[in-house]
């Protein structure tokens, strides 16, 4: 008969028939034990003594599965961290094209990984398993379809692969305490976003991978020699000086004028000189565009090269406002850059807006066809009616179901009423030749009703001012 090892709590969910429990033991007894791999040719046996070894990890649970999880070192953050800690081989079995690399298995080599499910099931189910040396019943005990979340490209809706690759990082973990300290000084609306969603993100902050293998973007200003010497360039003047040194040493270089284009491919053409006399070429990466966004408070003034007074007068900024999804975007990058560069907070107040959904509460998407073009309403009801509808629909931090009928209703009830009041006054004032400057009556001489209207106007204006200060724009 077959003998299988799995978590006791999952026996009823996994096993297909009545079984006899031969032995019970803690999972820790398996740690350090070796096992036969399902695809032994994927990683050469001589490459690592730690490959195909049982490890312990606190993220393996008994809520589903078998209590035993396969670790793919190069294809997931938890897997990678565990693999580096245990010294597992960092070996890619999938290329940048999403296909299995040569040597994985004759029937899988060169094939797109997401198109091989049936082939892999067939290989594991065959007598002897994937290489013919396993049990006659095959290596696959059971297969089961189930639903789970999986990342997809937001543009193409194609499935994505987590993929370990060489990158440049900002060591955000080194400034974690400062991030938390500066965040505590921000006046958040609502406060539970700053303490909860954003605060939790900061408490679990990871180092920031800022390099991207793209053509368009801000080039990483780092030059490296073959022996590993590096220079980081901080200005055009510094680049010009380094280019001049390289030219004097005999390295050919293009001109580097004051208005040099600092983007690819121009910037890639400069060869610099290392301190030991070696040629240095630029690291072929551009920066994460979110890094650009985080530099906005000083980049807008071309600081530190110009406008020091204007920068000092406007930093940290008084107020920012964006959707709640920016807790991992702009809210974070602003704070990350300012904490690492200036050792200071980036903004004093932040209003975190709820996301705008369609009338049925679903996320708007071009592929779903439920996008609302705001210009349709601007041209029909006007921008003010659209703005007033959104302001009064509810608390700004709550998700909003955008209903086009609501804009039309706001236009009819609010703005048409205001227009009719104005039109009534304007028509009769013109008919009577009314001149507000010449015929104005002092407030103290006006009727009680007129004075009450003025008092009520100033009271409402004061309340609105106070509520706007507290981001209670819906009250």
Range-by-range predicted roles:
Residues 1-4, 9, 29-36, 42-45, ...:
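Residue patterns forming the tRNA-binding/recognition surfaces of aminoacyl-tRNA synthetases
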Residues 18-24, 37, 137-145, 279-282:
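Short secondary-structure junctions
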Residues 54:
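Short beta-strand-centered aromatic/proline hotspots
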Residues 87-98, 214-216, 239-399:
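Alpha-helical recognition segments enriched in aromatics with Gly/Pro capping
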Residues 218, 347-350, 426-441:
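Short, glycine/acidic-rich hinge or "gate" loops at secondary-structure transitions
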Residues 302-303, 398, 430, 434, ...:
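Short, flexible helix-adjacent loops and helix caps
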Residues 335, 415, 419-422, 426:
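Short, amphipathic alpha-helical segments that act as regulatory/interfacial helices
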Residues 473-475:
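Conserved small/polar residues in nucleotide/adenosyl-binding loops
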């Amino acid at each position: 008969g077959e003998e299988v090892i799995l978590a006791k709590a999952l026996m009823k969910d996994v096993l297909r028939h009545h079984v006899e429990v031969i032995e019970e033991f803690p999972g820790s007894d398996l740690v350090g034990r070796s096992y036969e791999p399902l695809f032994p040719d994927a990683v050469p046996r001589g490459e690592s003594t730690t490959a195909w070894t049982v490890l312990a990890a606190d993220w393996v649970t008994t809520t589903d599965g078998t209590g035993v999880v396969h670790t793919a070192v190069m294809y997931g953050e938890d897997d990678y961290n565990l693999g580096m800690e245990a010294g597992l081989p960092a070996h890619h079995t999938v290329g940048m094209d999403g296909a299995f690399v040569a040597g994985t298995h004759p029937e899988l080599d060169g094939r797109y990984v997401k198109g091989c499910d049936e082939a892999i099931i067939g290989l594991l189910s065959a007598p002897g398993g994937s290489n013919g040396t396993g049990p006659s019943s095959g290596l696959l005990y059971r297969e089961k379809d189930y639903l789970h979340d999986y990342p997809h490209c937001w543009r193409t809706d194609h499935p994505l692969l987590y993929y370990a690759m060489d990158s440049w990082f900002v060591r955000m973990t080194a400034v974690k305490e400062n991030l938390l300290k500066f965040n505590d000084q921000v006046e958040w609306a609502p406060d539970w976003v700053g303490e909860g969603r954003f605060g939790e993100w900061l408490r679990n902050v990871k180092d920031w991978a800022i390099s991207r293998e793209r053509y368009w973007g801000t080039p990483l200003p780092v030059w490296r020699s073959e022996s590993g010497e590096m220079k980081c360039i901080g200005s055009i003047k510094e680049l010009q000086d380094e280019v001049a040194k390289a030219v004097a040493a005999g390295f050919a270089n293009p001109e580097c004028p004051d208005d040099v284009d600092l983007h690819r491919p121009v910037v890639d053409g400069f060869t610099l000189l290392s301190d030991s006399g070696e040629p240095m070429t630029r690291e072929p990466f551009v920066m994460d565009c979110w890094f650009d966004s985080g530099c906005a408070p000083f980049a807008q003034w071309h600081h530190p090269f110009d406008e020091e007074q204007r920068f000092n007068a406007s930093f940290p900024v008084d107020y920012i406002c964006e959707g709640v999804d920016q807790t991992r975007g702009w809210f974070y990058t602003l704070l990350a850059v300012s904490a690492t560069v200036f050792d200071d907070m980036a903004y004093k107040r932040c209003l975190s807006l709820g996301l705008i959904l369609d009338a049925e509460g679903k996320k708007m998407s071009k592929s779903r066809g439920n996008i609302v073009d705001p210009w349709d309403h601007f041209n029909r009801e006007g921008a003010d009616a659209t703005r007033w509808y959104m302001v009064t629909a509810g608390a700004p931090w709550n998700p909003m179901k955008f209903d086009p009928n609501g804009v039309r209703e706001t236009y009819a009830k609010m703005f048409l009423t205001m227009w009719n009041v104005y039109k009534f006054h304007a028509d009769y004032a013109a008919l009577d030749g009314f001149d507000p400057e010449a015929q104005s009556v002092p407030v103290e001489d006006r009727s009680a009703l007129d004075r009450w209207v003025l008092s009520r106007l100033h009271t409402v204006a004061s309340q609105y001012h106070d509520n706007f200060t507290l981001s209670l724009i819906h009250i």
